[in-house]
Design a protein with these regions (language model features):
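A conserved active-site cap/scaffold subdomain adjacent to cofactor or substrate pockets
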Residues: 214, 219-315
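An acidic, phosphate/nucleotide-engaging active-site surface
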Residues: 154-187
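N-terminal amphipathic/basic leader segments beginning at the initiator methionine
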Residues: 30-61
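Terminal cytosolic tails of multi-pass membrane transporters
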Residues: 2-26
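Catalytic or ion-translocation cores adjacent to nucleophile or general acid/base/metal-coordination motifs
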Residues: 140-152, 198-238, 531
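Gly-rich Lys/Arg/Thr-decorated short loops/hinges at beta-loop-alpha junctions or inter-strand turns
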Residues: 37-42, 76-94, 112-114, 153-161
Length: 669
């Protein structure tokens, strides 16, 4: 991409540039470019990171794999902010994702050579520090790049007792930096989608109230933000694709247009797959209802239309936008105390009696200890099987987790009590690992702050500081009434089978809550799912939601909310409080609810036989001449597996024209 194009690319393609890693030594000469002008030419924007720790080579893969205008990297999650906060306690100049710098050391020259601008939230808690580090790196490599950053999200001083308190900013600060000619923009805490809305707003010259276009970019950004989850990673129907294609999925990119519509795709020749299912799964991930609020716009997920445009190309269009809420989300991270755990292995017969004995023994130890842990949680996991052929499959696990503000309460006294039972407890006593010292854990909470009270600043390459004001208009994102459901399927024979034979799912965490997005791929399956999978049925299938997060008998059920999205043939469930105080508290076996959806898919219920006798329910890996070559030393794929069926394209709908209850539903997501 050496030629000049208007928009966010500015004059990068015309500059003299270093090859590969750049020319070492000397101070690069950075010329002052003219402000970039908006354009209607499509914007090709890719993502090379879905989390701090993602594939290191992805930045280079995306730069060399095909044409790009902008390359983003998402490094921040709720847990990451806590980790960076602890880093900053040890070193005040830390607080950003150092991996990003190592990636730039290898790829900054390549990006400059190709005229690709880089936008990343790797700045974490210290975007100014990362911007300085990038400038120093560029100077050492002799690469004349212009670096800008976005700040103002840090509200820690206003929240005493927190390790890090950061508002989720929007994309307009990023846009200001790009309009000023920045080649690299680093931010602190912005919404994940802002990494796309910012470049898009700069490229197309969108006004702050271009809500439909901004909403389209938000949806595209949400699909891209988790990297390979949009290209076949963590995908419910993964067995329908050849194993060779999924071994190393390529990272996604979006071809954005001036109206906010986009095509989700990936570089030619890379692994993975982009189809209606992979895009739908990611759209449902960590969202909730029809309104998806953000700092710049509230996107209406019930207006999204998806179309399979061709191999590995899904068009996203029709997205409507509304004025953003008057407040910003603020993530509060604090140290919650100290935790420790021990897992007792209970093998063979009388598992319940063995569990009762060791539990009583540990409770006796707590009773005589100088300080009983404030929180004690027992969990018996029945992984054992009768008449098992291996010792592992004959064993159940009894997990004991303790937490307390005082490290001593979960330290040596706790460890010693468990160790002292080695010769004095149930037959076959042993633990998975020797008890260790207590470790600190974090707590995440979400708060709100008025948009006008957060000093959103774009710090341009020349050092000027541009204030980004709050939106001129705002709207509280009230819940959307449930749309009419499709006509139910006529009565017929059913068969007891796992839900996952006909439905996909993806789940994730937001603070202490979890969401489970469930979707189907045919109109008949949607007519069944919309009526069958109610909140009551979900509670039956996932008993943990009905007995409280601690699993105690008689505990009140967790709040479960169902959102209906006919345009995606999907239901999105939000389970409140199932993760306790968030992922860092490690209060649950699966602390980020990553597999909650797969548990749901594994549960059996009565499914119409007409849905089970379909290619979708029988799926298997198809022969694919476009798949990358397989590893010659790997076991072959099943040659007898049935081919994948082409799913029906979903119908379309808008909030203004809901489907009639007796007609096939129109897709609101």
């Amino acid at each position: 991409m050496a030629g000049h194009r208007p928009g966010v690319r500015g004059t990068a393609g015309h500059r003299a540039c270093a090859r590969g890693r750049g020319v070492r030594g000397g101070s690069p000469s950075v010329t002052e470019p003219p402000p970039t002008a908006p354009t209607t030419a499509p914007l090709r924007i890719g993502n090379a990171s879905g989390f701090y720790g993602d594939r290191f080579d992805a930045l280079r893969e995306m730069l060399t794999g095909g044409p790009l205008d902008v390359l983003t990297g998402d490094y921040l999650a709720e847990l990451t902010m806590l980790i960076l906060g602890r880093d900053r306690l040890k070193d005040p100049v830390a607080g950003y994702a150092r991996t990003f710098l190592r990636q730039l050391e290898e790829c900054l020259g390549l990006a400059h050579e190709r005229g690709v601008r880089i936008v990343s939230n790797a700045g974490g808690l210290n975007p100014a520090g990362l911007a300085d580090a990038v400038r120093a790196l560029a100077g050492r490599l002799g690469i004349p790049v212009r670096v800008a950053h976005v700040e103002g999200d840090d509200l820690t001083a206003a929240h005493p007792g927190t390790l890090a308190a950061h508002a989720y900013l929007g994309g307009h600060g990023i846009a200001a930096c790009l309009r000023a000619g920045a080649d690299v923009v680093v931010t602190g805490r912005v919404t994940d989608a802002a990494l796309v809305t910012g470049p898009a707003a700069a490229h197309f010259g969108w006004a702050p109230d271009a809500y439909d276009a901004l909403a389209g970019a938000v949806v595209a950004g949400h699909v891209l933000e988790c990297g390979t989850q949009a290209t076949g990673g963590n995908y419910a129907f993964f067995t329908e694709h050849p194993r060779a294609r999924l071994r190393r999925p390529g990272f996604p990119l979006a071809e954005l247009r001036a109206d906010g519509s986009a095509v989700i795709t990936k570089h030619d020749g890379t692994g993975g797959v982009v189809d209606l299912g992979t895009v739908t799964a990611q759209l449902l991930y960590e969202t909730a209802g029809a309104r998806y609020p953000g700092p710049d716009v509230t996107a209406r997920l019930d207006t999204v239309r998806l179309t399979q445009e061709g191999p590995d190309r899904v068009r996203v269009e029709g997205v409507r936008g509304e004025a953003p809420p008057p407040t910003l989300k603020v993530g509060l991270n604090r140290l919650g105390g100290f935790r420790n755990e021990v897992v007792f292995v209970l093998t063979g017969l009388e598992v319940e009696a063995k569990a009762a004995l060791v539990r009583a023994q540990m409770e006796d130890a707590f009773a005589v200890a100088t300080c009983r842990p404030r929180h004690v949680r027992w969990e018996l996991v029945r992984t054992d099987r009768p008449d098992a052929r291996t010792e592992e499959t004959a064993s159940a696990l009894l997990r004991l987790v303790v937490r307390d503000p005082d490290a001593d309460a979960v330290g040596r006294a706790f460890s010693g009590a468990a160790v002292e039972l080695a010769l004095a407890s149930y037959p076959g006593f042993h633990v998975l690992a020797p008890p260790a010292k207590g470790t600190p854990y974090g707590v995440f909470e979400a708060a709100r702050a008025d948009q006008g009270a957060v000093p959103h600043l774009a710090v341009l390459p020349d050092g000027r500081r541009i204030a980004v004001g709050p939106p001129a208009d705002s709207r509280v994102p009230d819940a959307v009434p449930e749309p009419p459901l499709p006509a139910p399927l006529p009565p017929g024979p059913t068969r007891r089978a796992p839900l996952g034979l006909v439905a996909g799912a993806r789940s994730g965490d937001k603070g202490g809550d979890a969401n489970i997005g469930v979707w189907v791929r045919t109109e008949a399956a949607w007519r069944w799912l919309a009526h069958e999978l109610t909140t009551e049925r979900l509670r039956q299938l996932l008993p943990e939601t009905g007995t409280g997060a601690e699993g105690g008998t008689g505990a009140p059920g967790l709040a479960v909310t169902r959102h209906v999205l006919p345009n995606l043939r999907a239901l999105n469930f939000v389970v409140g409080g199932i993760l306790g105080e968030g992922v860092a508290a490690q209060a649950r076996f699966d602390p980020q609810a990553k597999a909650l959806g797969e548990w749901l898919r594994s549960r059996h219920l009565d499914i119409p036989e007409t849905l089970l006798d379909t290619p979708e329910a029988l799926g298997g890996p198809p022969d694919d001449p476009h798949a990358p070559p397989d590893d010659p030393h790997a076991p072959p794929d099943d040659p007898d597996a049935p081919p994948k069926a082409t799913p029906e394209p979903p119908p379309t709908a808008t909030p203004e024209s809901p489907p009639a209850a007796t007609d096939p539903p129109e897709d609101p997501r």
